[in-house]
From Swiss-Prot:
Belongs to the uve1/UvsE family. The lineage of its organism: Bacteria, Bacillati, Bacillota, Bacilli, Bacillales. It comes from Bacillus anthracis (strain CDC 684 / NRRL 3495). InterPro entries: UvdE, UvdE_bac, Xyl_isomerase-like_sf. Its EC number is 3.-.-.-. Keywords: DNA damage, DNA excision, DNA repair, Endonuclease, Hydrolase, Nuclease. Pfam families: UvdE. One of its GO terms (biological process) is nucleotide-excision repair. This is UV DNA damage endonuclease.
Amino acid sequence: MIMRFGYVSHAMALWDCSPAKTITFTSFQKLSKQEREDKLYDVTKQNLEHTIRILHYNIAHEIPLYRLSSSIVPLATHPEVEFDYIGAFTPLWRKIGALIKEHNLRISFHPNQFTLFTSDKPHITTNAITDMTYHYKVLDAIGIADSSYINIHVGGAYGNKEKAIERFHENIKKLPAHIKKQMTLENDDKTYTTAETLSICQKEKIPFVFDYHHHMANLCEEPLEELLPAIFETWSHTNIVPKVHISSPKSKKEFRAHAEYIDLEFIKPFLHVAKKINHNFDIMIESKQKDLAMLQFIQELSSIRGIKRISSSTLQW
């Protein structure tokens, strides 16, 4: 069983390398037309250049997974902001794409919790489609839209989970098919359990990104031993292995909050269930210390008898 690792957005080991520098709309409004254009251009350019630095860092450390920052283009989906963020940076998008393709990196996006398809308010669905389209356009500009995924949560329950799920199935029909083809769903820590998310994924033929921390915070009746094989099966129509999210609680009191690093003892039960399936899968680390937490966790895992480190960020068990 091969386990490959990655992390989210910021490389903590790199100095001044945020790929998510931004500008608020309030600040944006105070600028002249030319100043607005210059500010958007400068901030986006810096985010793209920082992304390139991060990719070089990942390549050097043989880190095969990476989640791009959704804030890579500031105010990209704001209705009052017009900005050709694709055409203005074609060489940089292509440079990012070349690095990703040459080194066979697995890239993803994870829009925020407001990108959802369960609402009874049409404008919420419209905004979700706009946001998904933005993420897809970025992946397309990079040249990896057909091999990368945009991960979201199911959404809210709005007092009636069954009706909300029905709305999801209806509202998702409005998302263009080529974008839906590149989306994944993740179980959340308060509303939609692993079993409920799995059922939706199976009906819509959407790959399921399983989050173990969320699962433990929002348990369902079905045991993980039964759920995980079915979760992995939702990836069978793709040409890539399943991906899971790993983090551990900040504390017992703040169980849903992410800790700085990974608590191996918290994760061990999941790993033992995965080992029984013995299926290759990828792991996205969602701890606060990102790449540093990932590398420390890999080091801890590699010290367990039977687990072999076969590259800087890949283990075999």
